Amino acid sequence: MVRAKRKLDHIEYALSTGQSRTHGFHDIDFVHQSLPNSNYDTITCETKIGELSLSSPIFINAMTGGGGEKTLHINEQLAYVAKHHNLAMAVGSQMAALKDESEAASYKVIRKVNPNGIFFANLGSEATIEQAERAVDMIEANALQIHLNVIQELTMPEGDRDFTGVLQRIEKIVLNSKVPIIVKEVGFGMSKETMQQLVNVGVTAIDIGGQGGTNFAAVENERRQRMLSYFNNWGIQTATSIIEATSTNNNLSFIASGGIQTALDVAKAIALGANTTAFAGYFLRILMQDGIEKLVDEIELLHTDLKFIMTALGAKTIEELQSVPLVVKGETYHWLMQRGIDTAHYSRR
């Protein structure tokens, strides 16, 4: 019951705390092209995460599950939206259902709604090989997300305090998994050092989960008697984390998430090097406040606007969008210079 109550608290406080931190995309400017030689009607948005082919560079990221009927209904609605737009979708952490079988229905519902969809299972980095297998089987997942959430756990009143052996557990799951593994942050971003460590143990897909979206330190602080307010502004902004990711020069697939709300955010994330982008809190807020049809309409507009932007840039495909010229400026530029990451190649390609 404690875990289920926490799931419901997360939804409540995620909606009430909002997405107030900046994601850094205001520091990214496209170089305008007056002769784009493009046609809106022939723009295509297909992309890939590793070997998984996706019809859109937008997917519905992990949100919830394991909190009884309310979370079942949310996942049911999100699965309907995913089916309508042919989007991939991730579920929230399934540890609740591994601990309490009665919660499994809140995850399994997505396959009932969308039998042929692309779905990602989800567990924390404390998971064992056996738990990873059960989570994948539970929803017949196409991939497994393993989330890294150190700051959330430290801020969570009942959270973990021991983070030893995480990399070794991830390596074991990678070596034994029948589906691809995606390692993701939950809103605090990933450094190039973290990504290199993950590459070294065989990880091939990463969701950088940058600062700018749902702030899980703020969410957990709402549940504390004594706030750990110093964690509320902790992390690496989304735009910065994407560039840190690409600087590793590894054959990784990158997912950009963390405060992405507009088609311009999507376009900038992809142009910086992401293969796809993920929405969570923004979609949840629309669903809970305005309803499912409004969310369906919003995603339609996102795709329309993304194609407008690609047309303006002369990018006929997602791959071409990844090579358009842009300029990195402001706080993002200064951070990257301090980190020894040159951004000049973005403006000269």
From Swiss-Prot:
The keyword Magnesium applies. It catalyses: isopentenyl diphosphate = dimethylallyl diphosphate. It is found in: Cytoplasm. Its cofactor is FMN; NADPH; Mg(2+). Its EC number is 5.3.3.2. GO terms for molecular function: FMN binding; isopentenyl-diphosphate delta-isomerase activity; magnesium ion binding; NADPH binding; oxidoreductase activity. Substrate binds at residues 6-7, 152. Transmembrane segments: none annotated. Keywords: Cytoplasm, Flavoprotein, FMN, Isomerase, Isoprene biosynthesis, Magnesium, Metal-binding, NADP. GO terms for biological process: isoprenoid biosynthetic process. FMN binds at residues 62-64, 93, 122, 184, 214, 258-259, 280-281. It holds the Pfam family FMN_dh. It is an enzyme of class 5 (isomerase). Mg(2+) binds at residue 153. GO terms for cellular component: cytoplasm. Belongs to the IPP isomerase type 2 family. PANTHER family: ISOPENTENYL-DIPHOSPHATE DELTA-ISOMERASE (PTHR43665:SF1). Involved in the biosynthesis of isoprenoids. Catalyzes the 1,3-allylic rearrangement of the homoallylic substrate isopentenyl (IPP) to its allylic isomer, dimethylallyl diphosphate (DMAPP). Homooctamer. Dimer of tetramers. This is Isopentenyl-diphosphate delta-isomerase. It comes from Bacillus cereus (strain ATCC 14579 / DSM 31 / CCUG 7414 / JCM 2152 / NBRC 15305 / NCIMB 9373 / NCTC 2599 / NRRL B-3711). The lineage of its organism: Bacteria, Bacillati, Bacillota, Bacilli, Bacillales. The gene is fni.
